[in-house]
UniProtKB/Swiss-Prot annotation:
Belongs to the LOR family. Transmembrane segments: none annotated. This is Protein LURP-one-related 1. Signal peptide: none annotated. Residues 1-23 are annotated as: Disordered. Pfam families: LOR. It comes from the Eukaryota. SUPFAM superfamilies: Tubby C-terminal domain-like (SSF54518). Might be related to the phospholipid scramblase and tubby-like superfamily of membrane tethered transcription factors.
Amino acid sequence: MQQPYEYRYPQGTGPSAPPPPPKAGVIVDPKYCSLHPVDLAIVRKVLKITDGNFVITNAEGNLLFKVKDPFFSLHEKRILMDGFGTKVLTLKGKIMTMHDRWLVFRGGSTEEVDLLYTVKRSNMVQITTKLDVFLADNIEQKKCDYRLEGVWLETSCFVYAGDSDIILAQMREKKTMQSVLFGKDNFCLTVNPNVDYAFIASLIVILVEIQISLRKLTKQLLLE
């Protein structure tokens, strides 16, 4: 009688097994991780009147985050605040770098000790926007920890874990007559379970800011 195979290691493990796919988990705060999918609505006020040009709500319409754009700043800087006005993240952009690099810090800090992750375009020349995300402890930045990829015409994008095909979140742009008339960009964002939605929301804000800077640069080049 043929004996069943015996495995020295459980299947899928051992010295020659491929590394497991990376997981998202907590990046900003455990309270921003849910056991269930989270649907968010992101509205960018193109013709902004107040200092909050992004508003992020949940499916029930409750305010979760808003983005403050300081008027007097030497750098591209955005502050992600919760519904109570507490600073959650500070997004500091280096737009003039070749890959449009953004540094994201905890709270209202811009100190190196509070750096959580870095976001930059994967290539200088792109047909669609692709962003690489490196956590603060990824010093060499040879492989990204997360990545964001837009699709044709940038009407939607996906956030992936590392170089894998594991989707952590999906964003799509929602065009309405009201949004066009009142100068607003509307985005629908679905964040998968156990994924930090404050982290994902910050990536979408950075994506939009990079797209805006690229459009301005393209317009300037065409006028020259």
